Amino acid sequence: MNKLFFKIILSFLIFLSAVNANKIAVVTKVKGLVEIMPTGKKLFSKLKAGSILADGDKIRTGTSGFAAIIFIDDKSTLKLKGNSEAVITGQRTAASISKKINMDSGTIRATIKKQNSSFVIQTPTSVASVKGTDFWLLTDPDKGDQVIGLEGIVSLKNIDTGQDVDVVQGMSGISTPDGDIGVEETEASSIPTDPSDSNEGGPSQFKIYLEGPNGTQKVMVIEYQ
């Protein structure tokens, strides 16, 4: 998707968020099995690209699933790989959204624009806090967390001990359920592949799914090159 296309989408979403403040992000890509449990609901349903996410929505991916999400205030992105589960939350303050991702398990890439608001990913083991960076986070409730720094600095804190480390480009932070935390050089083989890095040429279309006041769903279709 080109930059002009994203500008059009984001302009529309910023307008939408002004009307409905709990709308915080839009799903830009879905591959394989990806499901959503909307905030206030108890059941999962299929997630489609173009869906608008609200504060508190829960997303999970199947073994080969993948989802890409862009926040409407600053174009920060999240990418969830297979076997991942996360709750997307955001609190609006003036022109920005303070974002927190509660992640139970899986693999996620976060590319965060420099901002005044906070961005936090919390797992059962750790808390990762950033302001403008690019990193992978792999979490397992039994084994703990690995944060792989691609750009900028990530502050990684172990919940059990309260100890923290800074993770920079080329380094990986390790945090375990028993309280151990440290930093080591990243092995190239440990960096996950990003499915969205592959180029997909040719004209296409993007659908945005909107819900009316009576619960009916409408679809806005945008053609792009």
Language-model segment annotations:
Residues 127:
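Active-site-proximal inter-transmembrane loops
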Residues 57-61:
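A short, solvent-exposed beta-strand micro-motif common in secreted/extracellular proteins
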Residues 2-16, 20-23, 43-49, 62, ...:
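C-terminal interaction modules
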Residues 24, 55-56:
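Short coil/turn motif common to extracellular beta-sandwich-like domains
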Residues 22-41, 62-66, 82-84, 88-91, ...:
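Glycine- and acidic-residue-biased ligand/ion/polar-headgroup-sensing regions
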